[in-house]
């Protein structure tokens, strides 16, 4: 997989946003939490991930490049809030009351669990399977497990084993 280059101006905008919200949090909480590490290695349809123990935020470079400022404004505080909640409260529900409080009361941003960015460019190819009652789209990972004989999947409605039909033209 080739690494996408994130323009320096976009990286600076990410860091400016991160520092703004971290400063807000440190002032509000009376803490001196360090700056988390940021990298651009998140894959798939997730916009970002917070790695709690390593105090690191991973951002999806494709979604960042496609959405720029709206991505920064939404995803950076969202992931930072996860890190801050972990430092402040230890292990709690990922989008629980502590996280909502951190987002809304401390960082002063809406607490949204999921992004609404277009993901067609990062969605993985799927494979069509069928049972008695409907068609199912399996990811490449699940499809490969079926091919290797490591897994079989059944329909939740009828209970029948899924049978491979075709590759989706995504």
Swiss-Prot record:
Q: Which residues bind Zn(2+)?
A: 78, 82
* UniProt-listed Pfam families: SprT-like, Zn_ribbon_SprT
Cofactor(s) listed: Zn(2+)
PROSITE patterns per record = ZINC_PROTEASE
InterPro entries according to UniProt: SprT-like_domain, SprT_Zn_ribbon, Uncharacterised_SprT
GO cellular component terms given for this protein: cytoplasm
A biological process term (GO) from this entry: response to stress
SMART domains from the UniProt entry: SprT
Q: Where is the active site?
A: 79
| Metal-binding as UniProt keyword | yes
> Any idea what this protein is called?
Protein SprT
Gene expressing this chain: sprT
């Amino acid at each position: 997989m080739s690494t996408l280059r994130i323009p320096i101006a976009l990286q600076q905008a990410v860091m400016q946003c991160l520092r703004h919200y971290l400063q807000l949090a440190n002032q509000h909480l009376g803490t001196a939490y360090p700056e988390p590490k940021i990298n651009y290695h998140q894959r798939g349809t997730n916009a970002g991930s917070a790695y709690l123990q390593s105090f690191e935020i991973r951002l999806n470079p494709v979604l960042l490049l496609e959405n720029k400022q709206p991505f920064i404004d939404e995803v950076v505080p969202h992931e930072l809030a996860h890190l801050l909640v972990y430092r402040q409260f230890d292990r709690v529900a990922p989008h629980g009351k502590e996280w909502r409080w951190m987002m809304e009361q401390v960082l002063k941003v809406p607490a949204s669990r999921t992004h609404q960015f277009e993901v067609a460019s990062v969605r993985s190819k799927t494979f069509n399977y069928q049972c008695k009652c409907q068609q199912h789209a399996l990811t490449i990972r699940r499809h490969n497990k079926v091919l290797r004989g490591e897994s079989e999947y059944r329909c939740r409605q009828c209970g029948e084993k899924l049978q491979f039909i075709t590759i989706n033209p995504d």
